[in-house]
UniProtKB/Swiss-Prot annotation:
Belongs to the pectinesterase family. This is Pectinesterase. It is found in: Secreted, Cell wall. Disulfide bonds join C150-C170. Its main location: secreted. The active site is at D136, D157. One of its GO terms (molecular function) is pectinesterase activity. The modification Pyrrolidone carboxylic acid is found at Q1. It comes from the Eukaryota. One of its GO terms (biological process) is cell wall modification. Catalyzes the deesterification of methyl-esterified D-galactosiduronic acid units in pectic compounds. It participates in modulating cell wall during fruit ripening, cell wall extension during pollen germination, and in defense mechanisms against pathogens.
Length: 319
């Protein structure tokens, strides 16, 4: 798996590499690198919080497989962290790539916000990664991001933030939340209509984990709710199981943002994809024009034609 990329350094929990922790390898990496710096993370469970700061550019985390290389921690809001600082892994330096790794926050549903992965890295991409937590699993904080063949699981607002991000060919599963909670797949945070940000889920599969499936009637699950006034989310060309409530989307607080948000659905399939029972908000629409849908593809929305090829990850630019 990792033979196609030659690592600069190797991290191994068992001491057989250059470093025993991922954090040590990141600290030793060059600053402002113009070329890719590959940190191979051998199979193992790495219990640490890892920060890839702004100066650490073009870093790649290369794991041995999503079931074998696991970075895990449990910081959370209930125990005194902020949502922002709770992330098990935070990637900010531009050009960050990760492949064949699990990012996990094990705080659990009762601990409120607890982020597995926060990304503020421009032109960042993730391939064959698992992102596992409960509330606020994946913080797509800012800049242009791409996720391909990833598995994302969580409960409340589990993909959230204000990046321009496309999740393509991903499996996105709601899991059993805490008592009385509703699941929200997304909570997009656009604060101004001029921002070119949004969450796009394309050619993906939205469903439920095995712990939610038998009880999904007790825990309503929605495609998203508007965290900020101009929240923008598009779900297109994806299969949606009956885990998603027929209304599709849920308010944040009364009428807040319902006229100013942009929520679109385009050519989805599956038991949860029917749009006849959807919300009637001014900001919600079933997209019928392929031209409009094209604007949310990786080629248009995140300028994928200029950078995705260099990631070496698979992708498709269009519809």
């Amino acid at each position: 798996q990792s033979s196609t990329v030659t690592p600069n350094v190797v991290v191994a929990a068992d001491g057989s590499g250059d470093y025993k922790t991922v954090s040590e390898a990141v600290a030793a990496a060059p600053e402002d690198s113009k070329t890719r710096y590959v940190i191979r993370i051998k199979a193992g469970v790495y219990r640490e919080n890892v920060d890839v700061p702004k100066k650490k550019k073009n870093i790649m985390f290369l794991g041995d497989g999503r079931t074998s290389t696991i970075i895990t921690a449990s910081k959370n809001v209930q125990d005194g962290s902020t949502t922002f600082n709770s992330a098990t892994v935070a990637a900010v330096g531009a050009g960050f790539l990760a492949r064949d790794i699990t990012f996990q926050n094990t705080a659990g549903a009762a601990k409120h916000q607890a982020v597995a992965l926060r990304v503020g890295s421009d032109l960042s991409a993730f391939y064959r990664c698992d992102i596992l937590a409960y509330q606020d699993s994946l913080y797509v904080h800012s800049n242009r991001q791409f996720f391909i063949n990833c598995f994302i699981a969580g409960t409340v607002d589990f993909i959230f933030g204000n990046a321009a991000v496309v999740l393509q060919d991903c499996d996105i599963h709601a899991r059993r939340p805490g008592s009385g909670q509703k699941n929200m797949v997304t909570a997009q945070g656009r604060t101004d209509p001029n921002q070119n940000t949004g969450i796009v889920i394309q050619k993906s599969r939205i469903g439920a984990t095995s712990d939610l499936q038998p009880v999904q009637s007790s825990f309503p699950t929605y495609l998203g709710r508007p965290w900020k006034e101009y929240s923008r989310t598009v779900v297109m060309q994806s299969s949606i199981t009956n885990v998603i409530n027929p209304a599709g989307w849920f308010p944040w607080d009364g009428n807040f943002a319902l006229d100013t948000l942009y929520y679109g659905e385009y050519q989805n399939t599956g038991a949860g994809a029917a749009t006849s029972g959807r919300v009637t908000w001014k900001g919600f629409k079933v997209i019928t024009s392929s031209t409009e849908a094209q604007g949310f593809t990786p080629g248009s929305f995140i300028a994928g034609g200029s950078w995705l090829k260099a990631t070496t990850f698979p992708f498709s630019l269009g519809l």
